[in-house]
Amino acid sequence: MRSALRLAFAAVAAVALAPAWAASIMHGFADMSSMTLWVQTDRAVRVVVDLHPDGDPARRRRFEAATRAEDDFAATLRLAGLEPGTRYRYTVAVDGKPAPDPGRFATQPLWQYRTDPPEFAVAFGSCMYMNDRFDRPGAPWGGDFQIFDAIAARAPDLMLWLGDNVYFREPEWTSLEGMSARYRAVRAAPELRRLARATSHVAIWDDHDFGPNDSDGSFVMKGAALEAFKRYWPNPSHGLPGVPGVFGMVTWGDIDFFLLDNRFHRFPNRYPQAPEKAMFGRAQLGWLKQALVSSRAPFKVVVAGGQFWNRANRYEAFHNFPAEQKALADWLLEQKIPGVLFLSGDRHL
């Protein structure tokens, strides 16, 4: 009898200790013919995505990737060759085990020269602080994470993350491994999982997901910060050849979003005022000007982690770089480019 009981307890323990399906999933940007799916596992495994148009399982397609320790077990799958304006249903299998719930997304419609531009909804936010057991003493800053489910319930077409999307702590910003550990903990948070699969996500950064508070281009670990950002945010592009950073552009419907990097090339805030003192840098602003002139969008939304024009801001803002700010303002007035809007993060409500 004792042997039977031991066997029974062993069987129960084996069931209890069997690893559950464990992976973090986030939707990247979706265009008319593809969507980026980001997946992170807890070990090196094979990831398989089965995909088909919603309601048409006969047109099933398969995409595969492998997660590796050197990439923090994160993989980006480009689900390409899709049809415009189509809803898709997918299942992710990790090491042969399918996710408990299927995912869904839609490609952008092909509307040009055919119909009016489609209506769409954009959500945006910044400063996502999640409390940790080794945070400094005092009242915790993080909370009210029910906002993520509220956003997910609205099912926006696009979510713009405006920086400080994670907060590196002192033990973390000194290494790629530390930065990745913070990203991994936040991305796996239960509070974020529904939103991560509810819409397309595109991000920029600000100081706290770049390095220390108020960090700038002198931060010696900025290369590691950029590598971690690319690993966890599968934007369509990151910077330009020869000009590193997280800046780029995405288009949704008939609106262009210009994503700026206010950290990688930034001069220190306390640098003496001089013509060369810059927040964005000549190369990045040169690209922005060309892109604005080239854009045919009725609205052109310029996005950055810090405020552009609010002079009442006593903290970090573009007005601390008056030469660069004035040069951009003068250029915009001279060019008379219509429909330019500015969107920034870094403000806490």
Where are these predicted regions, by residue range?
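Bacterial N-terminal signal peptides that target proteins for export
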Residues: 1-9
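Bacterial N-terminal signal peptides
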Residues: 8-18
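Metal-dependent phosphoester/phosphodiester hydrolase catalytic core
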Residues: 21-349
